[in-house]
Amino acid sequence: MQNITQSWFVQGMIKATTDAWLKGWDERNGGNLTLRLDDADIAPYHDNFHQQPRYIPLSQPMPLLANTPFIVTGSGKFFRNVQLDPAANLGIVKVDSDGAGYHILWGLTNEAVPTSELPAHFLSHCERIKATNGKDRVIMHCHATNLIALTYVLENDTAVFTRQLWEGSTECLVVFPDGVGILPWMVPGTDEIGQATAQEMQKHSLVLWPFHGVFGSGPTLDETFGLIDTAEKSAQVLVKVYSMGGMKQTISREELIALGKRFGVTPLASALAL
């Protein structure tokens, strides 16, 4: 029998959650991570599955995700502990045939359940599937320190925030040319914030929750982690720059345009126009 804890997807989740903890992005039970899988990924591990998988209904049907398996972090679970006990802190779930709920196939032992932000994740997965023609498979939410800090001092506007991050580090425009979506402050763990996040995910691979954290989407765990890491590095630079009295020089609009042309990306027009 193959051990599912040695699978690429469990090992990938262990690495991503451990790296996020070491970055300081996921204190206590902060943060959540979901990865969309294929049936072929989990097929070799059926012997590891629960004999009687628990069924949990979704608060709203998501037919686009019907029959789709995911590996997810658990509600109330600490990222720092995933590496110590993957089966207690992670779970493999599979949405049923009509998208009305899901079965917990593996993990989430002792009656644990998936992250409370699962509505936001699933709704965002739906939008990123459509926006990227199925390429994006990962949704990651974390409490990236400097990005949160900037939501207190910058105008919480997509164009303004995006332009500042682009200027904070040259690679940012290349990594997220579609910019950063921003929500108003909302109560977490609700369908409302999930729907608002998904709406922004139609246009952006990064979405900020002011005074709370960030959502990122990408095709792989590495790409998604790297996306957030890049934005957070720029935010860290900006926090230092603002603390030293502000910018005396920066990357110009013309230089940003040249950067986009060199790397074949189309920068968000509203941010470029500022």
Curated annotation (Swiss-Prot):
Keyword Zinc: yes
Effect in UniProt of substituting E117Q: Loss of enzymatic activity
UniProt-recorded Gene Ontology molecular function terms: aldehyde-lyase activity; identical protein binding; metal ion binding; rhamnulose-1-phosphate aldolase activity
A Pfam family the protein falls into: Aldolase_II
EC number(s) reported in the record: 4.1.2.19
Cofactor dependence: Zn(2+)
Highest taxon above the source species: Bacteria
Zinc recorded as keyword: yes
Gene Ontology biological process terms, A to Z: pentose catabolic process; rhamnose catabolic process
Associated pathway: Carbohydrate degradation; L-rhamnose degradation; glycerone phosphate from L-rhamnose: step 3/3
Induction profile: Induced by L-rhamnose via the RhaR-RhaS regulatory cascade. Binding of the cAMP receptor protein (CRP) is required for full expression.
CDD domains recorded: Aldolase_II
Residues annotated to bind Zn(2+): H141, H143, H212
Effect on the protein upon substituting R28 to A/S: Severe loss of enzymatic activity
Effect caused by changing E171 to S/A/Q: Loss of enzymatic activity
One GO cellular component term: cytosol
Family matches, as InterPro entries: Aldolase_class_II_sugar_metab, Aldolase_II/adducin_N, Aldolase_II/adducin_N_sf, Rhamnulose-1-P_Aldolase
Family note: Belongs to the aldolase class II family. RhaD subfamily.
Function, in words: Catalyzes the reversible cleavage of L-rhamnulose-1-phosphate to dihydroxyacetone phosphate (DHAP) and L-lactaldehyde. Also catalyzes the dephosphorylation of phospho-serine in vitro.
Name of the molecule in the record: Rhamnulose-1-phosphate aldolase
Species the sequence originates in: Escherichia coli (strain K12)
